[in-house]
Swiss-Prot record:
GO molecular function terms listed in the Swiss-Prot or TrEMBL record: DNA binding
Ranges annotated as spanning the membrane: none
Domain PB1: 1027-1111
Name used for this protein in its record: Auxin response factor 19
SMART domains per record: B3 (SM01019)
Tissues in which the UniProt entry reports expression: Expressed in roots, culms, leaves and young panicles.
Lineage per the UniProt record: Eukaryota, Viridiplantae, Streptophyta, Embryophyta, Tracheophyta
Domain notes: Interactions between auxin response factors (ARFs) and Aux/IAA proteins occur through their C-terminal dimerization domains III and IV.
SUPFAM superfamilies from the UniProt entry: CAD & PB1 domains, DNA-binding pseudobarrel domain
Subunit structure: Homodimers and heterodimers.
Primary gene name: ARF19
Entry's localization field: Nucleus
The family this protein is said to belong to: Belongs to the ARF family.
Organism: Oryza sativa subsp. japonica
Keyword set includes Chaperone: no
Domain of life, source organism: Eukaryota
Length: 1161
């Protein structure tokens, strides 16, 4: 008995052989298959199994003899139809007694190859069984678990030059080096003789030579004979295999071509269908063996399924409409690829002949319709169900991004990703530990997209961010969801607008002064009409702890000044040490030993001061606890004291600002005088600063005397809880501490001043200062607020000065101001304060793991006309802040300004904004609001009094600043750690705006073009940044980052990337499936990874992209524009804030969701 259908076109994407009349006649004769068939009459040599499977394809796997299989006669009939390219006619009789599937015992399997076409097929002898033993079942399960070993082979599609009679066969270099024996390059030219055996054990001899320009591997002598003997044409494929015995094997795979006209003597396809069905029905009725022929290249799919595979697929999966799945397909040159699809229906393929059949009863839709022709019906054992839906972007409930190691796949976060989002990687899915099966049903892509759009807002805001709100300082926030919070913010915004609170009016309306005083005083939420029981606040220890940082508004002025004075002394010493160490590198080598004793003395003095501060801190904490209890007892009396508290705060802020400016100028004088060489050009500047210093000292003494006379009666009469006299030594010690604190912040900020910058603060009138929620941040020229560089990249960017008119003087020197060094308004008649330019190399790098966020705002009428900003804060423009996942430049001047300008909710609500959920955000100093008597809680319970960087989740590493501020001092003013760690970086991003801003949701993006484009000034150029971690992107997966310094070569990098994205083995060169690794260098050029030397690659790489074969093909067609190859359904990157629907991207956020690689640096 001969074989059937060995050369007909198979289903796409696999190719099949050409059809000949002789082969068609053999296939027709093989249709009449009965019981007890014996196979071919002539004795044929054994077929090499490795070569047979290589020619059959990577997806073909035959069950072993003696195992249980499930035979589908419906699939067998489809093989005949595919071979004849003709469907079953209506007059073919049906067999009602023939079930749709037969459980059979596979007696033997014989491999065959057509002697004329070399097409492979298999002969199987089956016997239906009603019961089976354990041995057959175990053998079937064992065969399912055992994988066929990977053979060394390469496959090439022949070109026209390869099949020409006068040419040779060009072998790819890597294939020749891997499969062929090595050449002797001492010969000229290098050449050798190769022998290869085909499926019929015929030996073919070729001459392998390395020649040409450029040089290449060629098979010359003997190749033309092989092409003519096998009747090969362009489009056919040849396969070279090296078996276990290191012998070369040679096979062919013919291209899919239209069949020629069939002779009239050949049996019709209907007869073939009848013969197949009749043989199966007879065997099922008598339990007798029967023989079938399986042509893997002609059959659309396997119709003899291992019993264990069938059981696992049918009973291990819960199939439902909308379920997502993967399916493996063969690609060109024996490659494989998984395609994603969705189950759209479950119905019978042929409800008339095969009712309730499981053969291809699943209707599916494919995600990529243009990737190749695929069937719209599949069987359940062909697919791999995915246990979760496909989100365009997952909900942003993950924590901050951290440096990842090579073994990150075993970490807790990676396991969470694999369990929650298996659709992100091609190899990630949820499987049952026993059956290794996906078990959870899903929905279709469109349904899940609609569900995500409708429910993501409420789910993310109410379910997750409500947890973050519980960690804030005020206990009332525990009962507020995100939606309620947004409504209250909008309500407050409308209320302020109704009361004529405007930023651009010269003066505030008189009717809103009580509201302003209320905002400045920072009264807790329960005093504003919100239902909260005072008893709960008194008896709840956690609430008392959360209110600890904000209770300092009860401290007298003497204590605040004492804290500032002590801080100034501490930082003065530290600044001198930093200046000595920075100037040491500029002086000759002989002067270096002279500086060492000075540094040692400064360190000793600093240690003594830290010990004294620790003792003072303990005493101060006791006093704060007493004051806190007094505050709780006087809650009912507090509304009557609002006006006095507001007046006290205005005067207190005035004193703080003057003292800070005075100390800053003194430190600048000392730093200039301590320099070894003072140029003649700097002498006039020093003299001018000395004059200003004398004026400031005189004004400060006068203002302090006046303010103390005004404040003491108010404190003694209106605030009984604050007039408790402290011992004189106790008052003096905190006063010294306050001076030291401010000096430390002033000089530390100077250490971060970039080169060629100077401070020019033009003061306004000498009225008391009233700060707003925006005055804690420096005015900038729309400077990007983040950096991805540990160097001083951001420091070199100059900021615009704050210009104002004084009624007693004219405007002077309009040079640029360093970041956060200039306050928005100065409440005294100071003329100007200038800072000496300092080279950045003299500044110590103290800020390697601190995030910088600056709210950019501008004065509307800078330097024009006379304005009074006492009760009219300057208008501000809103610019979204962003943070990156790497180290950034920190301007310590931010801390300087925050110390002197505590935030308030003055006539505007706090505006929150999205921040990237994977961003590492740190706080510069959490004690900014605790020194000057400002309640840190706004009307809604948010810590309003914090500085810019205090609003974020983590603090500076204590180890970096042990020599600057003691741990006890820092902890006394720090937000409780449990509350601080729970603040969501996606909810709080340090963004503030004007009161007329539209605010719809706490998690929404402000996309008002008119508001964002309010300024007519051109945007600043983006900053150049350097990365310590490199971003990696792959389609369908979230972006990752890796540390290039951990690898020593390309092989380690590829292995790590394969593990990171669960594509082990697919990035190897021997796979030849088209995967490419490309990267963008510092010149924004797209290059193939692996061409440059490793050291040069590490120095210039900016981001890496893993491209699939389809993306590589798209790049070849559309040009090398990597930015346009990101699909619209790209999974959202960890650095885009978790918002897949954002219409725009910050220029420096590095967000891949906007579909452009131009943003990646």
């Amino acid at each position: 008995m001969m074989k059937q259908a060995q050369q007909q076109p198979p289903p796409p994407p696999a190719s099949s052989a050409a059809t000949t009349t002789t082969a068609m006649a053999a296939a027709a004769a093989a249709a009449v298959v009965g019981s007890g068939c014996e196979g071919e009459k002539t004795k044929a040599p054994a077929i090499n199994s490795e070569l047979w499977h290589a020619c059959a394809g990577p997806l073909v796997s035959l069950p072993p003899a003696g195992s249980l299989v499930v035979y589908f006669p419906q699939g067998h009939s489809e093989q005949v139809a595919a071979s004849m390219q003709k469907d079953v006619d209506a007059h073919v009789p049906s067999y009602p007694n023939l079930p749709s599937k037969l459980i059979c015992l596979l007696h033997n399997v014989t491999l065959h190859a057509d002697p004329e076409t070399d097409e492979v097929y298999a002969q199987m002898t089956l016997q239906p069984v009603t019961s089976y033993g354990k041995e057959a079942l175990q053998l079937s399960e064992l065969a399912l678990k055992q994988a066929r070993p990977q053979t060394e082979f390469f496959c090439k599609t022949l070109t026209a030059s390869d099949t020409s009679t006068h040419g040779g066969f060009s072998v790819p270099r890597r294939a020749a080096e891997k499969i062929f024996p090595p050449l002797d390059f001492s010969m000229q030219p290098p050449a050798q003789e190769l022998q290869a055996r085909d499926l019929h054990d015929n030996v073919w001899t070729f001459r392998h030579i390395y020649r040409g320009q450029p040089k290449r591997h060629l098979l010359t002598t003997g190749w033309s004979l092989f092409v003519s003997g096998k009747r090969l044409f362009a489009g056919d494929s040849v396969i070279f295999v090296r078996d276990e015995k290191q012998q070369l094997l040679l096979g062919i795979r013919r291209a899919n071509r239209q069949p020629t006209n069939i002779s009239s003597s050949v049996l019709s396809s209907d007869s073939m269908h009848i013969g197949i069905l009749a043989a199966a029905a007879h065997a099922a009725a008598n339990n007798s063996p029967f023989t079938i022929f399986y042509n893997p290249r002609a059959s659309p799919t396997e119709f003899v399924i291992p019993f264990a595979k069938y059981q696992k697929a049918v009973y291990g999966n819960q199939i439902s409409l909308g379920m997502r799945f993967r399916m493996m397909f063969e690609t060109e040159e024996l490659g494989t690829r998984r395609y994603m699809g969705t189950i759209t229906g479950i119905s019978d393929l042929d409800p008339v002949r095969w009712k309730n059949s499981q053969w291809r009863n699943l209707q599916v839709g494919w995600d990529e319709s243009a990737a190749g022709e695929r069937r719209n019906r599949v069987s359940i054992w062909e697919i791999e169900p995915v246990a979760a839906p496909f989100f365009i972007c997952p909900p942003p409930f993950f924590g901050a991004k951290r440096p990842r190691q090579l073994d990150d796949e075993s970490s807790e976060m990676e396991n969470l990703l694999k369990r929650a989002m298996p659709w992100l990687g091609e190899e990630i899915c949820i499987k049952d530990p026993q059956t290794q099966n996906t078990i959870m049903p899903g929905l279709s892509l469109v349904q899940w997209m609609n569900m995500n759009m409708q429910q993501s807002s409420s789910f993310a805001n109410t379910a997750m961010q409500s947890e973050y709100l519980r960690s804030l300082s005020n206990p009332n926030m525990q009962n507020l969801g995100a939606a309620d919070l947004s409504r209250q913010l909008c309500l407050q915004n409308q209320l302020l607008q109704q009361n004529n609170i405007q930023f651009n009016t010269p003066k505030l309306s008189q009717q809103m002064q009580p509201v302003n005083e209320l905002a400045k005083a920072g009264i807790p939420l329960n005093q504003l009409g919100v239902s909260t029981k005072p008893q709960e606040q008194i008896h709840d220890a956690s609430n008392l702890q959360r209110q600890q940082p904000s209770m300092n508004h009860m401290l007298p002025l003497s204590q605040a000044q004492t804290n500032l004075g002590q801080a100034q002394v501490l930082v003065q010493n530290q600044m001198q040490q930093q200046h000595a160490s920075s100037t040491q590198g500029q002086q000759p080598a002989t002067s270096q030993p002279l500086l060492l004793p000075q540094q040692q003395q400064q360190q000793q003095q600093q240690q003594q001061q830290q010990q004294q501060q620790q003792q003072q801190q303990k005493l101060l904490q006791q006093q704060q606890q007493q004051l806190l209890l007094q505050q709780q007892q006087q809650l009912s009396k507090m509304p009557a004291q609002l006006s006095s508290l507001a007046n006290q705060q205005f005067q207190l802020t005035d004193q703080q600002l003057q003292l800070q400016l005075l100390q800053k100028l003194q430190q600048q004088q000392q730093s200039l005088l301590s320099q070894p060489a003072v140029t003649l050009a700097q002498l006039p500047l020093i003299q001018e600063q000395q004059k200003l210093l004398l004026d400031m000292q005189q004004q400060l003494s006068n203002s302090q005397t006046l303010s103390q006379q005004q404040m003491m009666p108010q404190q003694s009469t209106k605030v009984p809880s604050q007039n408790t006299p402290l011992p004189l030594p106790v008052q003096q010690e905190p006063q010294q501490k306050l001076l030291q604190k401010q000096a430390m912040l002033a000089d530390t900020s100077e250490a971060a001043v970039p080169p060629t910058t100077s401070v020019n603060v033009i003061s306004t009138t000498g009225s008391p200062l009233m700060t707003t929620g925006a005055t804690h941040s420096v005015l900038t020229e729309e400077i990007p607020s983040c950096s991805t560089s540990p160097s001083t990249a951001n420091g070199n960017h100059l900021l615009q000065p704050i210009l104002g008119r004084n009624k007693h003087c004219s405007m002077i020197n309009t040079e640029k101001v360093p970041q956060s060094a200039a306050p928005m308004s100065v409440p005294s008649s100071l003329e100007a304060v200038t800072a000496t330019p300092r080279m950045m190399k003299d500044s110590p790098k103290l800020n390697h793991n601190v995030k910088q966020s600056v709210v950019a705002s501008k004065l509307a009428n800078a330097g024009t006309g006379s304005q009074n900003y006492v009760n009219n804060p300057p208008p501000t423009d809103y610019l979204e802040t962003a943070s990156s996942a790497t180290s950034v430049w920190l301007s310590q001047n931010d801390g300087l300004l925050h110390q002197n300008f505590p935030m308030s909710n003055f006539n505007q609500p706090q505006m929150f904004k999205d921040a990237p959920p994977d961003a590492e955000i740190h706080a510069a100093n959490t004690s900014n609001n605790a020194l000057f008597g400002i309640n840190g809680d706004g009307p809604l319970g948010f810590p309003i009094g914090l500085g810019t960087d205090d609003f974020l989740s983590n603090g500076i590493d204590a180890a970096k600043y042990e020599n600057h501020i003691s741990t006890e001092i820092d902890n006394s003013y720090r937000i409780p750690k449990d509350a601080q760690q729970e603040i969501s970086s996606s909810m709080v991003s340090q963004s503030f705006g004007a009161s007329d801003m539209a605010f719809n949701s706490i998690d929404s993006t402000i996309n008002d073009g008119g508001f964002l484009n309010r300024s007519s000034w051109p945007p600043a150029a983006p900053l150049k940044r350097m990365r310590t971690f490199t971003k990696v992107y792959k389609r369908g997966a979230v972006g990752r980052s890796i540390d290039m310094s951990q690898f020593s070569g390309y092989d380690e990098l590829k292995h790590a990337l394969a593990r990171m994205f669960s594509i082990e083995g697919q990035l190897e060169e021997r796979q030849r499936i088209g995967w490419k690794l490309v990267y963008k260098d510092h010149e924004d050029d797209i290059l193939l990874l692996g061409d440059d030397p490793w050291e040069e690659f590490v120095g210039c790489v900016k981001c890496i992209r893993i491209l699939s074969p389809q993306e590589v093909q798209q790049m070849s067609l559309e040009g090398c524009d990597l930015g346009n190859n990101i699909p619209p359904n790209q999974a959202c990157s960890s650095s885009d804030g978790g918002n897949a629907w954002r219409a725009r991207c910050d220029q420096n956020s590095g967000n891949p969701s906007n579909g452009s690689y131009e943003q990646f640096e």
